[in-house]
Each structure stands twice: as C-alpha cells, then as structure tokens.
C-alpha cells in the first residue's frame, strides 16, 4: 500500500493500553486504537495521555491506526 492511500488525522491520546497501544480520539470525534510507528519507537519518543498526535490509517480499517507524529 502506498503512502498516498493512507488517511491522516489529528487527535488526542485518551488512554494508554497494554502492549504499547493507545486509544486516540480524533478531531472528528471517532475513537481509534493506535500503535507507535517504528521511528517513534526507535528514537524513544514517549507518547503520554493528553498528547496531541498525528495518526495514519488505512481506508480499509478505520478502527486501527499508527501514530506518526507527536506534538
């Protein structure tokens, strides 16, 4: 799947889940389960509750995503 097919949304981390998963509330009100992208893990960037994050999602499954940016 190419990067062009990925959907990108902004949201806020609502809850920290086991196995490095996060519950993120998107700006449009939807709640998704997301994991940290490889670059975030490699550079040891911490994602905490209340952080504003950028989430990438595939159009095929809009309940799961990948956190690509924290800021």
Curated annotation (Swiss-Prot):
Q: Which domain of life is it from?
A: Bacteria
Q: What keyword terms does UniProt attach to this protein?
A: Cytoplasm, Initiation factor, Protein biosynthesis, RNA-binding, rRNA-binding
Domain S1-like residues, every copy: 1-71
- Give the Gene Ontology MF terms in alphabetical order: ribosome binding; rRNA binding; translation initiation factor activity
Q: Where in the cell is it found?
A: Cytoplasm
Is Magnesium among this UniProt entry's keywords?
no
Does the keyword section mention NAD? no
Q: Which Pfam families match?
A: eIF-1a
UniProt GO cellular component terms: cytosol
The similarity annotation says: Belongs to the IF-1 family.
SUBUNIT field:
Component of the 30S ribosomal translation pre-initiation complex which assembles on the 30S ribosome in the order IF-2 and IF-3, IF-1 and N-formylmethionyl-tRNA(fMet); mRNA recruitment can occur at any time during PIC assembly.
Q: What does this protein do?
A: One of the essential components for the initiation of protein synthesis. Stabilizes the binding of IF-2 and IF-3 on the 30S subunit to which N-formylmethionyl-tRNA(fMet) subsequently binds. Helps modulate mRNA selection, yielding the 30S pre-initiation complex (PIC). Upon addition of the 50S ribosomal subunit IF-1, IF-2 and IF-3 are released leaving the mature 70S translation initiation complex.
Name listed for the protein in its UniProt record: Translation initiation factor IF-1
Q: Which organism is it from?
A: Pelagibacter ubique (strain HTCC1062)
The beginning of the lineage is: Bacteria, Pseudomonadati, Pseudomonadota, Alphaproteobacteria, Candidatus Pelagibacterales
